[in-house]
UniProtKB/Swiss-Prot annotation:
Lineage: superkingdom: Eukaryota
Molecular function (Gene Ontology), one example: uroporphyrinogen decarboxylase activity
Source taxonomy: Eukaryota, Viridiplantae, Streptophyta, Embryophyta, Tracheophyta
PANTHER family membership: METHYLTETRAHYDROFOLATE:HOMOCYSTEINE METHYLTRANSFERASE RELATED, UROPORPHYRINOGEN DECARBOXYLASE
Organism: Zea mays (Maize)
Protein name: Uroporphyrinogen decarboxylase, chloroplastic
EC number: 4.1.1.37
Residues binding substrate: 73-77, 92, 122-123, 200, 255, 370
């Protein structure tokens, strides 16, 4: 089992090892500098008893040499090695549901760039067939839900997701990834948030205006709440399953929650996210949980109320402002604009340093504000990681 692997020993990835980082009073006050990669500082290990720590104890500051770094969608379509693999295996579902392919794709950026986090190659919709919701991902169109859930009867047919039965390849892949990266990086899993999953399932796929999910929310809220509860129970179980099989941190994607007004977010997203976090805390109190919601500027103060350890900011929120609005007990991730990777190397460097300086020297995971875009030059991604790993506080 992956849980037998030793804990991460790299100081730069301490935020993934234990839930102890915080913004602190000096966030944004220090300027990063370049230093030799051999420099190291001490850091605090997770609680040896594995028990629940008090809030203050969980959030004690850790001294680290630099912010850990990984990128959303770091494994994917911008890489030539991935493009060649797609020619052999054109079906996305085959690539994301075959153990060997999942491991190979997940490790492609690790072998080239050596990020501090290696995220499982998968999709937030992967659990749907196990919940009696058939779907596919069609090239040029995206996710397609064959039988959208738009009635009480349809929602009643949705069953609880049992990961061991429906996605054993996820657990197998996570175990292999832990063995492959050993103690040199954190292995990350991820899940979709209840409202985002419900949006896909009610709309029938991606949407520009979310008319159908909002129609259900505002005219038949009981039906939507029933569906959200089913996703909540299932995703909590899925996070635990991933952790039991080697995931050292899990990111929750609530991509479409920002289509809701603050009041509607508090009804249709926030309580279910909090329920997931509370459930995971009962069995996995030291598992770091990250929440990403694109375009979350209007909801920012509400995101820490979910109880997650890290809020991942998109690039439309200034990092320094985001720090202030989130408060000192929430770590941050992000938030370089993915478009920056199309700029010159000098420009990329400036943006990285600006982000790190504004984030401060504790409780920050360097990342993009969204996934890497198709067509991003690989050499610029390599430069991003080179600069990031050369930073010293």
């Amino acid at each position: 089992m992956a849980t037998a692997c030793p804990p991460l020993s790299l100081p730069s990835t301490s935020l993934f090892r234990g839930r102890s980082a915080r913004a602190g009073p000096n966030a944004g006050s220090s300027r990063p500098s370049a230093a030799a990669p051999s420099e190291r500082r001490s850091w605090r290990r997770p609680r040896p008893d594995g028990g629940r720590a008090a809030a203050g104890e969980r959030n004690q500051r850790e001294e680290v040499e630099r912010p850990p770094v990984w990128l959303m969608r770091q494994a994917g379509r911008y890489m030539k090695s991935y493009q060649l693999l797609c020619e052999r295996y054109p079906s996305f579902r085959e690539r994301s549901e075959n153990v060997d392919l999942v491991v190979e794709i997940s490790l492609q950026p690790w072998k080239v760039f050596k990020p501090d986090g290696v995220i499982l190659f998968s999709d937030i919709l992967t659990p749907l067939p196990g919940m009696n919701i058939p779907f596919d991902i069609v090239k040029g169109k995206g996710p397609v839900i064959y039988d959208p859930l738009r009635t009480a009867a349809a929602v009643n047919e949705v069953r609880e997701f049992v990961p061991e039965e429906w996605v054993p390849y996820v657990g197998q892949a996570l175990n292999i990834l832990r063995q492959e990266v050993k103690n040199e990086a954190a292995v990350l899993g991820f899940v979709g948030a209840p409202f985002t999953l419900a949006s896909y399932c009610v709309e029938g796929g991606s949407s520009k205006n979310f008319t159908l999910i909002k129609k259900m929310a505002f005219s038949e809220p009981a039906i939507l709440h029933n569906l959200l509860q089913k996703f909540t129970t299932s995703m909590a179980n899925y996070i635990k399953y991933q952790a039991d099989n080697g995931a050292q941190a899990v990111q929750i994607f609530d991509s479409w929650a920002t289509e809701l007004s603050p009041a509607d977010f508090e009804e249709f997203s926030l309580p279910y996210l909090k329920q997931i976090v509370d459930s995971v805390r009962e069995t996995h109190p030291d598992l770091p949980l990250i929440l990403y919601a694109s375009g979350s500027g209007g909801l920012l103060e509400r995101l820490p109320l979910t109880g997650v350890d890290v809020v991942s900011l998109d690039w439309t929120v200034d990092m320094a402002e985001g720090r202030k609005r989130l408060g000192s007990n929430t770590a941050v991730q992000g938030n370089v604009d993915p478009g920056v990777l199309f700029g010159s190397k000098e420009f990329i460097t400036r943006r990285i340093y600006d982000t790190v300086q504004k984030a401060g020297n504790v409780g920050h995971v360097l990342n993009l504000g969204h996934g890497i875009k198709v067509g991003t030059p690989e050499e610029n991604v390599a430069h991003f990681f080179e600069v990031a790993k050369g930073i010293r506080y």
